[in-house]
Every structure is written in structure tokens, then in C-alpha cells.
Amino acid sequence: MRLALGLLLSVSFGFPTSFAQTGHSHHSHGAAACPAGIDARGDSSLQTVNLPPSQKCSTSSKSGFMLPDPNCTPGAVNPSLTLAILKDTNFTTRCVRDHATPPADKAKTYHWYQITKPTNNSGQTQTCELDHLISLELGGADTLDNIWPQCGPSHVALAKRFFKRKDTVENFLAKRVRDGKMTLADAQKGIATDWTQFLDEAEKECPGGKCAN
């Protein structure tokens, strides 16, 4: 499909404590309804790409960490996830996760990246995550231009695998936006461009992925 060129959100406000506590968590608040105004299929890509891609997708390496192919996974935001919605205590990732793209379709990205879909991929044996390049907590889209298989390394503890360390970056950026130290647009663009640029500071401020309020 042809994905339209999108624009980053450009508003700059803070998140409340409730959003900070959500972090990368996927928990829901009981049966509470999601905030009104969410278009779970919203997709504003950071650059125009053709999907499925006509060429093979390849990760690149930055200081030993993997980055996605921008020609396949440029990152995308969901314009309906405004700051007001992200601040709403009833908003959790369940409000948008798997609504635009079901898990079976997300798994196609393994083939795009020439990666064998892992088996027993849960708990301590998890080696890959179908990652939202711009996290849902930062207003990322649940669409294929924002999803890539982030894998490895398998020889280290689960907490040290790439996708877990990126989770820490996501929580750190959410806190920075909440504290008014970074705009949401800058956080989105930064994590889509090179999530590793924030890793050292994120792991200092949010050890184990847990950021102090």
C-alpha cells in the first residue's frame, strides 16, 4: 500500500503522573472505556514508503545495537493520539494495539527483514519483539510502517536484550515529555531516527526501565 507522507505532532506539554506510571506497560484499567476521539487506525508516516516493500529490508548497526531500515520502517505517528488523550487516565495501549494491524500481519515483517520467526518467544526465552519504532505511549501508530522485528542478542539475559533496553528509552522519553524537557514531536522524531542516542541517559535515569516520578 502507498502510505502518505505525514507530519510530526508539534505540540509541547507535559504528561501527568498516571501516564508516567503507564510507561511501557500494556496493562488496562479494568473495563474502563478508552477516551473518545481515538482513531485506532491513524497513520501519519514520517516518510513515504511502499509496503509490502519491493526490496529486502536490512537492519543497520549503531554501537552494537540494531536500527530498522528506514525504507521499510520509517516510523509513524497516530495523529488522533493527542496530548490530551495520552494524558487521559483511561488511555492505555490496549486502546490502539492490534486494532490497525492484527498480530498475524505484523509477523509479516519477519519475512521482510529476512528473519526466521522465533518459536517459544516469550518469557526468558523471548529473543524478538515486533517493536513499535515510535512507541504507542509516545503516540506511535499501530501500522506496518512503524513495526519491525527487533531481535537479540540471545546470549544475554532478557533484561539486556535490545527490545528491553529500548523499552527503557521509551519510558525515559515519556518522562522527559511529561516533565516538559522535550516536546512530543522531538521525542517521536528522535526515537524514530536513532533510539540508541538516548540509551546511556535513559539507563541512568530509569534503571531497569523504571523512572522515578
What would you call each of these model-derived segments?
Residues 14-129, 137-213:
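Nuclease and nuclease-like effector domains acting on nucleic acids or nucleotide cofactors
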Residues 4-14:
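Bacterial N-terminal signal peptides
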